[in-house]
């Protein structure tokens, strides 16, 4: 009797690890989504962010809806998917196309910095371990800089 595994055998999954189907089979390591606490983490992060956006004189007018709830929901879905959680964003809205979706709005360095300031409130409130905080903030900062489409004040 041999203890060799057959290539089609499914790996043993540790408790608390959620496998997602990937191009080459199920993922076998926890995703960032799992590491930070999943949906509840992203819901709180995004809610804290939108509390600031709701009163921001530069950012709030960029949202066509008076109620920021739908925008909050979309951002939660996007971040969950980006970080390895459910693919609900793409299922409901298609490819994220972040730059294209932001073209109608004047995103200048001031708007970028305001966006980052409100997001920093949520990130700070999350009290993440330094590694996860650094990974998250690096992405948010790069994404914010990439959305700039105007240098007009």
Which sequence ranges carry the predicted segments?
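Core of compact, soluble alpha-helical bundle domains
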Residues: 2-153
């Amino acid at each position: 009797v041999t203890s060799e595994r057959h290539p089609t055998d499914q790996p043993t999954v540790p408790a608390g690890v959620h496998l997602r189907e990937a191009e080459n089979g199920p993922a076998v390591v926890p995703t960032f989504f799992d590491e930070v606490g999943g949906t509840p983490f992203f819901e709180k992060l995004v809610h804290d962010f939108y509390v600031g956006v709701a009163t921001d004189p530069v950012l709030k007018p960029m949202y066509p809806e008076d109620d920021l709830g739908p925008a909050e929901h979309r951002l939660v879905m996007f971040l969950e998917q980006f970080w390895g959680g459910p693919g609900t964003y793409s299922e409901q809205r298609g490819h994220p196309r972040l730059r294209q979706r932001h073209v109608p709005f004047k995103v200048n360095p001031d708007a970028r910095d305001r966006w980052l300031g409100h997001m920093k409130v949520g990130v700070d409130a999350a009290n993440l371990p330094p590694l996860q905080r650094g990974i998250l903030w690096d992405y948010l900062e790069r994404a914010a800089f990439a959305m700039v489409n105007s240098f007009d004040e």
